[in-house]
Amino acid sequence: MAEHDYHEDYGFSSFNDSSQEEHQDFLQFSKVFLPCMYLVVFVCGLVGNSLVLVISIFYHKLQSLTDVFLVNLPLADLVFVCTLPFWAYAGIHEWVFGQVMCKSLLGIYTINFYTSMLILTCITVDRFIVVVKATKAYNQQAKRMTWGKVTSLLIWVISLLVSLPQIIYGNVFNLDKLICGYHDEAISTVVLATQMTLGFFLPLLTMIVCYSVIIKTLLHAGGFQKHRSLKIIFLVMAVFLLTQMPFNLMKFIRSTHWEYYAMTSFHYTIMVTEAIAYLRACLNPVLYAFVSLKFRKNFWKLVKDIGCLPYLGVSHQWKSSEDNSKTFSASHNVEATSMFQL
């Protein structure tokens, strides 16, 4: 959903011909760039998250708390990316889907955005408990599974509640073309504060605190798996910062310095960083599922079952993967059955 749409026709009407020409160039660029990025994220996110869901449901039983979260995360991302074709069409043309669809898609878009970010936070906390409090976590696996299901349900409820402003105040406005959004400064401020708190600062602070302790714990541990785990942690942190920080920084600047709306370059920056931020829906399956040896084994089972690839030495690959993971599984029995092993 283009963040600049709500105000794209404000702050330019009184400018000279040069500024108007720059703004028209920006509008033409936005009609090409953002819809194309939306469609790329949609296709990649649809394929990746669908694969994770299919494998999680049909090839792997929910045997750990991490598995519970790894079902909810791709579900949220999948529904999220399914709203993008509508915004892509609206970016090229205008909003033609009516007021009910406007409110519905704003709600779906926002609910699944919050759900995805909150689940990422829970996955981080779960990793902390598994690595730092391994014995306690192992002895309370059944209780943790129950707690995980309750937490997942609570996350969806919280996401619905904090999305109510968009659902209630979302409407179709005619600003030279029909636009779906919420054109109210007070609502925009509330939405921005909520998005930055739940969608950026909470996951970021949780990652910093939990991963700092996890890294310290792993550095005192032995074995080859330590180095792989540290690489995964740094990769997760780097991807989160690179995709989410630029867009959130731009939104923060926009909320405190409204004069930037008069700068076409600022609109370009908002648009590009927004597209980068949405890449998380494509990268989450790679970061949180495909890094798992067990998940990759189940993926090849799926490929074999649907006949996409001939069965050529796959069993040897599975065996090799399982043998390579025995050392880690023996020392970290808590999540030995989980698809994701940190």
From Swiss-Prot:
Disulfide-bonded cysteines: 102-180
PROSITE patterns: G_PROTEIN_RECEP_F1_1, G_PROTEIN_RECEP_F1_2
Membrane topology, Cytoplasmic segments: 60-68, 126-143, 216-231, 294-342
Extracellular topology ranges: 1-32, 90-103, 165-187, 260-275
An example molecular function term from Gene Ontology annotations: C-C chemokine binding
Function: Receptor for the C-X-C chemokine CXCL16. Used as a coreceptor by SIVs and by strains of HIV-2 and m-tropic HIV-1.
Stated family: Belongs to the G-protein coupled receptor 1 family.
Protein known as: C-X-C chemokine receptor type 6
